[in-house]
Amino acid sequence: MVERLVANEKVEGSNPFARSIRNMEKLYKKKCVACDGNTLPFDASEIHKYLKKIDGWEVKNSNQKNYYLEKEFKFQNFLESQKFINKVSSIAEQEGHHPDIFFGWGYAKIKILTHAIMGLAESDFVLAAKIDQI
């Protein structure tokens, strides 16, 4: 069974889109940091705090503890999906943080977690924000 968490945030101000962009930019500017495996994965409250800073990503798990980020992107055709995946791959190499990628005709699905801790850490949200900048 897969659980899903989605940010349920009260939007303040008259322009929620601008607020969302400001939140993403803060994460986008950060660098992914390698995890040595001794770091604890984020708990639910930390996950919710960071989830508010990225748009359209869902937090899922398959066994009640190993949370991961997931987002599906839609495209006009296979080639556009492939171009997007190539850009994601380039960012992943630059950051040293590699998501699981699934794609086909008209879609790409990205799954992000920190494999060393089998959960979520700040770098996962940083990578998600960087991918959203494509």
Which role does the model predict for each range below?
Residues 16-23:
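Short, Lys/Arg-enriched N-terminal segments with co-localized hydrophobic residues
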Residues 24-79, 86-107, 111-134:
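Long, contiguous binding/interaction regions
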Residues 4-7:
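Short, low-complexity, intrinsically disordered N-terminal modules
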